[in-house]
Amino acid sequence: MAIAATISMCLINQKGGCGKSSTCFHLAGALAATGHRLLLVDADPQGSISQAFFGSDAVERFTPWETLAGLFDDECDSISSGTLIRSTHIEGIHVLPANQFLATYNAPSPERAGVMQFALRDFLEPLTAFDVVLIDCPPNLYQCSWNAMLPGASH
């Protein structure tokens, strides 16, 4: 079942342990079971969504350029969706993973913050392979959360 335009939603709350990652994980499963194509964006440096799909050991071995952190790194200006987005064992669900490297970019210096604020929106905008984009946010309102709110506001 295809949706006319991609729907982007971020699950955000300034409190940890309130179920953002669990809700994102289970909502993705339910939507995939009904035939929707999902992209889960793990915007939390804890990488809970990434660990749920790929395991802790694998997630710890990802380089910054294999995770959401690559969008914020000046050295990765030509990074592609094929490099960042990973398929999972569940049909219809793909993940843009995160790990500890994302913490470096969650609270950038003031001169970098302006350049970084549209990175995720600009990355997601041309993607047409997904019906729904779910973004799991960290328990704060720093850079990763602001980035997560922009794609939903533009749809």
Write out the residue ranges for each language-model feature.
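P-loop NTP-binding core
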Residues: 1-155
